[in-house]
Amino acid sequence: MDDKSMARGRKAFFTGFPIRHSRSPLIHGFWLKEQGIDGSYEAVEVKPEDFSSFAASLAANGFAGGNVTIPHKEAAYAAAESLDEAARAIGAVNTLWLENGRLCGGNTDAYGFAANLDASAPGWDKADRALVLGAGGASRAVVHALLSRGVCHVSVVNRTLSRAEELAAHFGARVYAHGWDEAQALVSNAGLIVNTTALGMSGHGEGQDFPIDLTCAPKEAVATDIVYVPLRTAFLNKAEKAGLKTVDGLGMLLHQAVPGFERWFGQRPQVTQALREHILADMAKAGAL
């Protein structure tokens, strides 16, 4: 029996609360059709107080696993009986699967971040120094990816310095905390600049100028934003005008979905231009470009 036959009828889920317009079902639906797999990926809205019972009943409800988003990532971390290395390092789970009856948890955000850069800016990990703007939950995955790929010095800048200090303390050596007032000076020797803040995204000052001058960045520097709505953020527009190589955040969303699909359906999908165009068409329809 081949892997596709074994995957027949398998179900995976996507859960959060509330479930906003997620493109994960579109991504996995595209792959299921492309691979010819008779499976499903469905959105299930679960209230925070119900998550533990939901996680405990995955097998009974016929699920092979699924994706978890806000506000359940920490609860999924606590519910998992086994964690992968990325989930342990980041402290949050976005992917669940069943293995020999045990609930396992992983985090694919760091993988997605690095794979996006690998595809769009090969050699990005040769940078000795990286500058991460923002110290929220998403920045943990970014920092883990940078450290895993050998970046020697990671500067994390945040308006609330204590948040950056907490993140630096979590990861230890090679990660340094700075206040936002230090960001400008740090740009000049950063080989990679990552925006994880909401500045310039829809509903957060979109159309406004990004408040850091990027013209002093090294000419070979790469600038990437984990935000993908809008696709071209104020940060990326400013980086492009400064002559930097830019990478948008949509690829991170697409690549982070790969490991989960393989876990649940037994086939490793590819992130292709056709998939990207499929998601961009949906974004355009929703006025999210």
Curated annotation (Swiss-Prot):
Pfam hit, one: SDH_C
One Gene Ontology molecular-function label: shikimate 3-dehydrogenase (NADP+) activity
Pathway: Metabolic intermediate biosynthesis; chorismate biosynthesis; chorismate from D-erythrose 4-phosphate and phosphoenolpyruvate: step 4/7
UniProt cross-references to InterPro entries, sorted A to Z: Aminoacid_DH-like_N_sf, NAD(P)-bd_dom_sf, SDH_C, Shikimate_DH, Shikimate_DH-bd_N, Shikimate_DH_fam, Shikm_DH/Glu-tRNA_Rdtase
Binding site for NADP(+): E85, G134, A135, G136, G137, A138, N158, R159, T160, L161, S162, R163, I226, G249
One GO BP: amino acid biosynthetic process
Record flagged with keyword Transmembrane: no
GO cellular component annotations of the record: cytosol
Protein's name in the database: Shikimate dehydrogenase (NADP(+))
